From Swiss-Prot:
It comes from Caenorhabditis elegans. One of its GO terms (molecular function) is succinyl-CoA:3-oxo-acid CoA-transferase activity. Keywords: Mitochondrion, Transferase, Transit peptide. GO terms for biological process: ketone body catabolic process; ketone body metabolic process. Belongs to the 3-oxoacid CoA-transferase family. This is Probable succinyl-CoA:3-ketoacid coenzyme A transferase, mitochondrial. Pfam families: CoA_trans. The active site is at residue 342. Its main location: mitochondrion. Its EC number is 2.8.3.5. It catalyses: a 3-oxo acid + succinyl-CoA = a 3-oxoacyl-CoA + succinate.
């Protein structure tokens, strides 16, 4: 009988008596006992010692993979003055939106405000501090902390307010639109002719994590896309609290199936009564896809049908939210495009049929999706590593404004519209990235969106490769400006000149604007 088995089978007095011979085994028993003590009886018990003014890393992407029970527990335990580091803050009445409603959050460090109206209201009215951080940079700052790296260089955000400073962190409560606290400029350095920004790691006092299941030692598994920011955040706090849907005995989760090893898990809670709402429910069309009948819808379809011609068989592409998500409707049968979603999915498939949706499987627009055969799923840090590392063949995204030299603005209208940059800054800043902007040629007010210089805060400087609108297609040279290469068949070059607020060259091979056919298969 092995020595450990004899000790475990011995009377209590024998277990407690430490001798030189059994000292090592006693340490193992002590460790095993303390590891099993990780399991807390309730979420409230697990979070009750979090102090006021703590910095919390809170996992999730939209409402996918958020620690529902732990967040609700904090609304009951009542901590104040919290700094929350999270990709976004859920919605008004769920996720971190609950802590915003109870005024328990003093500051957010996020990449995206999204559809949370209360988040935007508190920020614009000076009630809440907000440090905008590009999504990939946020993931890497967290990952770096867990890996013991104090700072790193990234191309993301160079030439924007994120690097140059001046982004509003806090507005005045008394003077509408007045910036009370602005971000500071960051150190830059050039490597191999490319400009980089230095970013510092983000440590948390506590991390609030949602996983699928764990064993009693704290080895954890995520399910589908619910790993997202939970993955790197597990490793970057002094105390990581994990809530799961199932707790099993050690050994049930095979070693190769462990996503986060027990060394990173300090407290474990069995979650209850999960709601798992889907932020933007979308479902597969029943029957043929019908063309839009509205003017706005027709414009979007024209843009998407042209954007689809940018795809080549076998390429890896990232599509932004909005118009870019329509482009796959025009990919022909037998044509493979590996769609990457910034929340960690490679191989995004179509919307699910109603009734088959899975809240743990969403895209960057927080819509339910399916997976194609051969798909894979990674954490947010790995997702942006492949973006920042220039592994994407193409990025297609929308814009508020573009300049003639390829500058892009699509994340903020100061004092008015607050969405955040999300992953856009990372996507357009990757060295050598091919960036296709898709947008209406003019705003709702009829004002040109292609300008000499962007008037809004930049998402990227000199980053656009091609602009596709509902009227024309331009190639972009970051030194020489725009060249008109295609015009919609019912328009003339003069029409384009009237609605474009900058000069442009006209290609010798100017042709009618291409349109991919709608795939009804």
């Amino acid at each position: 009988m092995p020595i450990l088995s004899k000790i475990w089978a011995a009377p209590a007095a024998g277990i407690l008596r430490k001798t030189p011979r059994n000292a090592h085994q006693m340490r193992l028993i002590s460790m095993t006992s303390s590891m099993k003590a990780k399991v807390f009886n309730s979420a409230e018990e697990a979070v009750k010692d979090i102090p006021d003014n703590a910095k919390l890393l809170v996992g999730g992407f939209g409402l996918c993979g958020i620690p529902e029970n732990l967040i609700q527990a904090i609304t009951k335990t009542g901590q104040k003055g919290l700094t929350c580091v999270s990709n976004n803050a859920g919605v008004d009445n769920w996720g971190l939106g609950l802590l915003l409603q109870t005024r328990q959050i003093k500051k957010m460090i996020s990449s995206y405000v999204g559809e949370n109206g209360e988040f935007a209201r508190q920020y614009l009215s000076g009630e809440l501090e907000l440090e905008f951080t590009p999504q990939g940079t946020l993931a890497e700052r967290i990952r770096a902390a867990g890996a013991g790296v104090p700072a790193f260089y990234t191309p993301t955000g160079y030439g924007t307010q994120i690097q140059e400073g001046g982004a509003p962190i806090k507005y005045s409560k008394t003077e509408k639109g007045k910036i009370e606290v602005a971000s500071k400029a960051k150190e830059t350095r050039q490597f191999n002719g490319i400009n980089y920004v230095m970013e510092e790691a983000i440590w948390g006092d506590f991390a609030l994590i949602k996983a699928w299941r764990a064993d009693t030692l704290g080895n954890i598994q995520f399910r589908h896309a619910a790993g997202n920011f939970n993955n790197p955040m597990c490793k970057a706090s002094k105390c990581t609290i994990v809530e799961v849907e199932e707790i099993v005995e050690p050994g049930v989760i095979a070693p190769n199936d462990v996503h986060i090893p027990s060394i990173y898990c300090h407290r474990l809670v069995l979650g209850k009564n999960y709601k798992k709402p889907i932020e933007r429910p979308m479902f597969a069309h029943e029957g043929p896809i019908k063309p839009s009948t509205s003017a706005a819808g027709k414009s979007r379809e024209i843009i998407a049908a042209r954007a689809a011609l940018e795809f080549t068989d076998g390429m890896y592409a990232n599509l932004g939210i909005g118009i870019p998500t329509l482009a796959p409707n025009y990919i022909p049968n037998g044509f493979t495009v590996h769609l990457q979603s910034e929340n960690g999915i490679i191989g995004v498939g179509p919307y699910p049929r109603k009734g088959t949706e899975d809240a743990d499987l969403i895209n960057a627009g927080k819509e339910p999706i399916t997976l194609l055969k051969g798909a894979s799923i990674v954490g947010s840090d790995e997702s942006f590593a492949m973006i920042r590392g220039s592994h994407m063949d193409i990025t297609v995204l929308g814009a508020l404004q573009c300049s003639q030299f390829g500058d892009l603005a699509n994340w903020m209208i100061p004092g008015k519209l607050v969405k955040g940059m999300g992953g856009a800054m990372d996507l357009v800043s990757a060295p050598g990235a091919r960036v296709i902007v898709v947008m209406e040629h003019v705003s709702k007010n009829g004002e040109p969106k292609i300008l000499e210089h962007c008037e809004l805060p930049l998402t990227g400087k000199g980053v656009i490769s091609r602009i596709i609108t509902d009227m024309a297609v331009f190639d972009v040279d970051t030194k020489n400006g725009l060249t008109l290469i295609e015009v919609r068949k019912d328009l003339t070059v003069d029409d384009i000149k009237k609605l474009t607020a900058c000069k442009f060259e006209i290609s010798e091979n100017l042709k009618p604007m291409g349109q991919a056919p709608l795939n009804q298969g």
